[in-house]
Structures are given as C-alpha cells and as structure tokens.
C-alpha cells in the first residue's frame, strides 16, 4: 500500500453481521485497545473476496498505527479508533 496520509480514505477489515434495519449492519473490528463493535450503514461497507472492509478516514499517522474515524454508532467509542497499519486497505 502506498504511504498513508491524513484525510486518506481506507478500508478497515471487519466482521459483518445483520443489523436492526435492512440498510444497517453490526460490525466488529480490531483496534490497538481491543475489538470495538457498532452499527454502520450498508453503504459504508464493501466486500473483497471473503473479506469485509468498512470505510474509514485517516485522522493521524503514527509510527505503529493509524488513528481513523469510522462513520457509525459504536458501543464504546465515538468512531475514533487506533488500528494497526496491517488492518488498513487502500480504498
């Protein structure tokens, strides 16, 4: 993946399950602090082979991780998360 920078749109690997509404999905993805779960609109997701990706915007680039914002409603965060760079895919 090319060098990542602030405001780049990326995909973050996630697990997808049905949500409460037809256009919403429950997702879980790994962060540096452990997994987080929440609801996102179906339009924020794409499937590449067997892998699901949720759209995220890079807010900060650190040596070991990325700070990203994921649009949605999460149980333990406001959508900001620190993820390992290996979980990021070019959008």
Go through each PLM region and give its residues.
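Short intrinsically disordered terminal tails
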Residues: 1-2, 88-91
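Basic/aromatic-rich interaction segments and small domains that mediate binding to polyanionic partners
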Residues: 3-85
């Amino acid at each position: 993946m090319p060098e990542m920078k602030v405001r780049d749109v990326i995909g973050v690997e996630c697990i997808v399950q049905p949500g409460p509404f037809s256009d919403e999905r429950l997702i879980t993805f790994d962060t540096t602090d452990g997994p987080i779960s929440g609801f996102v609109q179906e339009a924020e997701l794409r499937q590449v082979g067997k892998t699901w990706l949720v759209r995220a915007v890079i807010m900060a680039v650190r040596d070991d991780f990325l700070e990203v914002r994921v649009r949605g409603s999460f149980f333990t965060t406001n959508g900001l998360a620190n993820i390992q760079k290996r979980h990021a895919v070019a959008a």
